[in-house]
């Protein structure tokens, strides 16, 4: 019987090995066939792109000023330049990756950080110079900003974006590389760059000279054309530019001002993300009252979207809830390095009960109490955690997490006794 079983297992292993070998052979053959097809299609696509580029360039040389057709040709040529730059960068990356796999440890060092999108920028800047009333000028300015930002030139990108969404206050100068260099090196004698290029002053504080209070530079903005496209995305990118600026004293205020433009429309597809960024900007600036209000607004908006559509409004809801807990548990809201309780201020538990900071009647309200208690527990402030959890259990006895937090309270008591 054992010999029969062993023979059967040997036969099965042989069949499995043969089938697997044939499967791998066929898969390798198909992979090679598809790879050849893909390479051929890519070659044909690249050749077609180069022919199209040559045709558009020839057309533009022949008809450089036709207001009806030349800007369209330039716009399409810029897209083709963008595609070519992206393909060239990918080819460089693939070659460097292969070289490193073959033992060249320094192969990636010479790789540029981003595609060279300057040809696209140049042709689109030419549109701005020659055809400022082009019907797709919104897309031109957005893509100029996008390309410059990809090439790590964020100040120039911001200028293009502001000209798109705030055209009544900011004009775009296609020669911005020159005037930014002048701003860094000093203006030539008799040349007033600040007057000629007002966007040079965007990096400085925007304040009322009498009160020294921040004045929103984006309060009354109008787009470069009615019904302009890319407005929401552009305001978000402007907000990100300011949010990442750690030099300007009013960078956080400017980022909030940009995000708030998006928040004017609750139906905007970037609404939830902008709301989160506003909350985070307030948190980063230690403006904790505004931070908790906006994190709470995000949680409520996400839940409203869930109720209306069956889908969560924001994937950032859990993180917003986490930061609500962190902020309420933080003990120095006035940021003077002295605990608030030592100055007669409120405790985290007291702030949780403050209706002005945290609505007490929302479905998610007990979750904030639970999250705050968790922060106190992680900080080994067990009594604070127990007090908050006991309050939450008493006020929301039917909450789904009641059994869990009964156990957490018991655990906290044990840890406190150790």
What are these regions (language model features)?
Residues 1-418:
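Acidic, polar-rich low-complexity tracts and alpha-helical solenoid repeat scaffolds
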């Amino acid at each position: 019987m054992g010999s029969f079983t062993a023979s059967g297992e040997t036969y099965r292993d042989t069949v499995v090995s043969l089938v697997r070998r044939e499967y791998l052979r066929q898969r390798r053959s198909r992979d090679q066939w598809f790879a050849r097809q893909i390479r051929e299609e890519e070659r044909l696509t690249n050749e077609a792109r180069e022919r199209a580029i040559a045709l558009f360039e020839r057309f533009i040389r022949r008809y450089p000023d036709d207001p009806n057709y030349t800007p369209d040709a330039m716009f399409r040529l810029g897209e083709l330049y963008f595609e070519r730059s992206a393909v060239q960068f990918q080819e460089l990356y693939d070659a460097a990756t292969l070289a490193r796999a073959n033992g060249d440890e320094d192969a990636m060092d010479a790789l540029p950080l981003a595609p060279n999108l300057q040809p696209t920028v140049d042709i689109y800047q030419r549109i701005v110079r020659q055809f400022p009333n082009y019907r797709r000028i919104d897309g031109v300015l957005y893509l100029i900003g996008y390309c410059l930002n990809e090439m790590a030139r964020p100040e120039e990108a911001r200028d293009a974006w502001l000209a798109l969404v705030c055209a009544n206050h900011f004009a775009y100068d296609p020669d911005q590389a020159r005037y930014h260099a002048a701003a860094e090196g000093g203006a030539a004698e008799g040349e007033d760059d600040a007057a000629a290029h007002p966007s040079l002053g965007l990096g400085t504080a925007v304040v009322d000279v009498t009160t020294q209070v921040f004045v929103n530079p984006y309060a009354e903005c109008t787009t470069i054309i009615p019904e302009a496209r890319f407005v929401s995305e552009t305001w978000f990118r402007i907000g990100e530019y300011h949010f990442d600026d750690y030099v300007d004293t009013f960078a956080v205020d400017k980022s909030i001002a940009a995000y708030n433009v998006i928040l004017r429309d609750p139906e905007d597809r970037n609404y939830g993300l902008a709301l989160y960024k506003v909350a985070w900007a307030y948190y980063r600036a230690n403006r904790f009252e505004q931070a908790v209000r906006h994190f709470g607004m995000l949680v409520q908006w996400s839940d409203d979207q869930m109720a209306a559509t069956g889908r969560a409004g924001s994937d950032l809801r859990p993180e917003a809830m986490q930061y609500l807990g962190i902020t309420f548990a933080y003990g120095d809201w006035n940021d003077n390095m002295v605990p608030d309780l030592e100055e007669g201020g409120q405790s985290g538990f007291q702030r949780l009960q403050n209706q002005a900071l945290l609505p007490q009647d929302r479905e998610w309200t007990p979750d904030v109490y639970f999250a705050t208690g968790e922060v106190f527990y992680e900080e080994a402030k067990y009594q604070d955690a127990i007090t908050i959890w006991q309050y939450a259990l008493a006020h929301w006895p039917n909450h789904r997490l009641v059994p869990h937090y009964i156990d957490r309270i018991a655990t906290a008591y044990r840890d406190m006794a150790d």
